[in-house]
């Protein structure tokens, strides 16, 4: 754990940045360099977030650093004077809708008041239930990627499935760890040439990266099935096999593979709970179905002192996260009278626009989650567990959704306890939203305090930790 983890109970700063991934690090660096007092809080033991995930010293010694540029960025952030609070989970917002409530690594209560709040909380992996998804040996691609990077071999024989460009590098990372990847199953048809894929020619570096993954998979004899999804994972005590079917024709079996590792995920969805608690207006993204904060191009939310950056603003990859973090910081500096270089802001805007072009291309090539997730949820067999924490089946959710008032997601949660367990709907949220009846009412899982499980002592202690005005 970092040395700089101990924090007094009430903290103030010019800017509080929540999340030390690429977006939060970039924002914090820019703000601190301009002379602002910046607090950077992250629940992980080390700063870096998902992309620059910093393994502990033993792992670094054993397998090396697969993204050393992340370590260099963290070092620059520290050198700029940012107060880094690792192991600090922001779990809520006080009644003033301004003071952040956090818990230290030891579970002590910490209040944070800042003139600006930058939410850089990243993304969740998008999971969709299927029969057998609760079996040991079934994991998300992000977890498989992280464990592989840390030298852990999660299985001997794997299938990687779901949708999105992330599946290919994950399959390659597994191969590097000596896992025999028998197949990649992609729900869409992104690798079949068509009018949309012509757009890829405008991004030669990305095309070359894709080609290198494809070549590695081909060398290892990995089949890439398109229009294919996981219908069922089989096994008694852990996953032993997987049945893959056509996405466009669920009755058609594509293959059944014996595996001891199944990695399934449908991309990423923004982690926007903190901005919602801070009162930021949100919209439903028509393409992804995700709840996203309403933002200016520089990440300013409807609450003027709150900015949302990186994947929390919409999944778009690490380079965009870095650029969004900087853009928000420059905007904050401009509004605080420390006018940053105009040319710099213009260059950043152009860079962001070019990155947005690639995000649009990706969205055009892979199936839109707003259609994919409900289609998968509709075909779920009744006894499939949707909420693994509270053991609620698809049939139970459907019955609650069909009852009076069932178009309301909170009513479905209340009637079934789905989404009310330890993970607070982080896993089953998209499926719950997709299974509801539609119609009036709240169609999204609400953001609720606490954002993470925390010791009761951290809440009780709050009464003794008065906030300070900023
Ligand atoms: C599991 C997973 C694995 C991924 N692996 C890759 C990969 O290998 N390659 C790739 O290109 N992309 C990967 N991504 C996508 C990745 O999120 C982005 O490319 C990039 O890391 C986004 O940067 P960010 O700063 O927006 O968010 P992140 O890097 O996700 O950083 C967000 C940080 O916020 C912290 N945080 C969130 N909520 C709180 C809270 N309430 N209190 C305190 N701290 C909080 C998190 O601990 C995290 O460190 C992965 C995503 C996930 C979810």
Residue locations for each model-derived region?
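Residues forming the flavin
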Residues: 2-416, 420-422, 426-470
């Amino acid at each position: 754990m970092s040395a700089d983890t101990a924090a007094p109970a009430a903290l103030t700063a010019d800017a509080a940045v929540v999340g030390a991934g690429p977006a939060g690090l970039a924002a914090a660096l820019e703000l601190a360099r301009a002379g602002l007092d910046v607090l950077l809080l992250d629940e992980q033991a080390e700063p870096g977030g998902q992309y620059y995930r910093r393994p502990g010293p033993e792992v670094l010694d054993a397998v090396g650093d697969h993204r050393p540029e992340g370590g260099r960025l963290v070092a620059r952030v520290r050198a700029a004077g940012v107060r880094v609070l690792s192991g600090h989970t922001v779990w809520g917002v006080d009644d003033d809708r301004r003071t952040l409530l956090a818990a230290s690594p030891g579970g002590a209560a910490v209040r944070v008041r800042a003139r600006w709040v930058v939410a850089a909380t990243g993304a969740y992996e998008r999971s969709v239930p299927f029969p057998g998804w609760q079996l040991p040996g079934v994991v998300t691609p992000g977890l498989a990627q992280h464990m592989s990077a840390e030298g852990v071999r999660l299985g001997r024989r794997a299938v990687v499935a779901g949708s999105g460009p992330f599946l290919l590098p994950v399959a390659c990372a597994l191969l590097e760890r000596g896992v025999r990847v028998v197949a990649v199953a992609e729900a869409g048809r992104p690798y079949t040439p068509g009018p949309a894929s012509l757009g890829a020619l405008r991004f030669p570096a990305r095309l070359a990266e894709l080609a290198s993954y494809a070549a590695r998979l081909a060398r290892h004899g990995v089949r890439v099935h398109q229009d294919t999804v996981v219908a069922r994972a089989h096994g008694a005590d852990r996953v032993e096999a997987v049945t893959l079917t056509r996405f466009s024709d669920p009755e058609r079996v594509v293959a059944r593979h014996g595996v001891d590792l199944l990695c399934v995920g449908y991309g990423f969805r923004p982690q926007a709970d903190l901005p919602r608690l801070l009162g930021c207006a949100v919209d439903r993204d028509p393409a992804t179905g995700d709840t996203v904060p309403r933002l200016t191009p520089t990440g300013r939310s409807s609450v003027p002192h709150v900015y949302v950056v990186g994947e929390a603003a919409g999944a778009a990859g690490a380079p965009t996260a870095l650029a969004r973090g900087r853009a928000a910081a420059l905007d904050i500096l401009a509004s605080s009278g420390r006018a940053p270089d105009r040319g710099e802001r213009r260059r950043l805007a152009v860079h962001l626009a070019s990155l947005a072009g690639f995000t649009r291309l990706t969205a055009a090539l892979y199936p839109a989650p707003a259609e994919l997730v409900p289609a998968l949820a509709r075909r779920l067999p009744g006894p499939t567990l949707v909420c693994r924490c509270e053991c609620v089946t698809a049939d139970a959710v459907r019955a609650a959704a069909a009852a009076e008032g069932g178009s309301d997601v909170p009513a479905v949660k209340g009637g079934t306890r789905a989404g009310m367990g330890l993970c607070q709907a982080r896993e089953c949220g998209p499926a719950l939203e997709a299974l509801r009846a539609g119609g009036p009412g709240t169609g999204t899982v609400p953001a609720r305090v606490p954002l993470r499980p925390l010791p009761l002592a951290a809440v009780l202690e709050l009464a003794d930790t008065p906030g300070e005005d900023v």
